[in-house]
């Protein structure tokens, strides 16, 4: 799963007062990877923590229970719309219809972390070793675990569950950047880094 519109800034862009989610396949989720711009329409780049669910997550689980049930990895998401000139012009309902504009998710080493380990942490995005932008985990509904809990509840409302073996790209620390060719790296405080090579 990927979760979008997890900050007030992104919700305002799409006139929404809540997040939304879409489903992703194993094909679109990769460990430290190389991508080609020719495989995408108008891709962006976002900095997100990826939760790998080890044990079923319930909507009423505590923060600590969710963290215990998941491994967390540094991640990069590549949103991509199927419409021309889609960002930020796509509407809220078009984003839903487009599977929350999923393109790809790349993640690094996954480990067990506590709630405090990923609370109020910084992420720094680099392109070709030059700093591009910084962001903070508080942009993700105050804490990324809140995003996972929101998803678990949203699934339960549909009669579904957030089950072991699933992954969750939990929401961006910063507004997205246009993806371009080069070598990207995101360094996350406490969580390590993830790299992505993008070919023209």
Q: What are these model-derived regions, one by one?
A:
Residues 145:
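Gly/Ser/Thr-rich active-site loops/lids in small-molecule metabolic enzymes
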Residues 155-159, 191:
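Extended mid-to-C-terminal alpha-helical interaction segments
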Residues 162-175, 179:
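Conserved metal-binding segment of the jelly-roll/cupin
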Residues 148-153, 166-168:
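Short, structured beta-strand/loop micro-motifs enriched in basic residues and often containing a Trp
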Residues 1-142, 180, 193-200:
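Catalytic-core "active-site belt" of small-molecule-metabolizing enzymes
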Residues 127-129, 170, 189:
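Short strand-turn-strand beta-turns centered on an Asx-Gly dipeptide
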Residues 184-186:
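A short tyrosine-centered beta-strand micro-motif
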Residues 171-172, 188, 198-200:
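Active-site proximal loops enriched in glycine and acidic residues that flank catalytic Cys/His/Asp
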């Amino acid at each position: 799963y990927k979760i979008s519109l997890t900050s007030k800034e992104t919700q305002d862009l799409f006139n929404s007062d809540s997040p939304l989610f879409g489903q992703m396949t194993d094909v679109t989720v990769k460990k430290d990877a190389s991508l080609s711009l020719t495989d995408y329409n108008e891709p962006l780049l976002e900095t997100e923590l990826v939760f790998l669910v080890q044990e079923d997550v319930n909507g009423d689980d505590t923060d600590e229970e969710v963290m215990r049930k998941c491994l967390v990895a540094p991640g990069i998401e590549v949103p991509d719309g199927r419409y021309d000139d889609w960002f930020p012009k796509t509407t809220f309902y078009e984003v839903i219809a487009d599977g929350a504009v999923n393109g790809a998710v790349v993640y690094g080493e996954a480990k067990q972390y506590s709630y405090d380990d990923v609370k109020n942490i910084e992420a720094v995005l680099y392109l070709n070793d030059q700093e591009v932008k910084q962001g903070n985990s508080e942009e993700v509904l105050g804490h990324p675990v809140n995003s996972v809990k929101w998803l678990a509840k949203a699934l339960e409302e549909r009669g579904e569950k957030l089950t072991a073996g699933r992954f969750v790209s939990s929401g961006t620390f910063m507004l997205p950047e246009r993806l371009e060719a080069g070598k990207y790296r995101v360094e996350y405080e406490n969580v390590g880094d993830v790299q992505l090579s993008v070919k023209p």
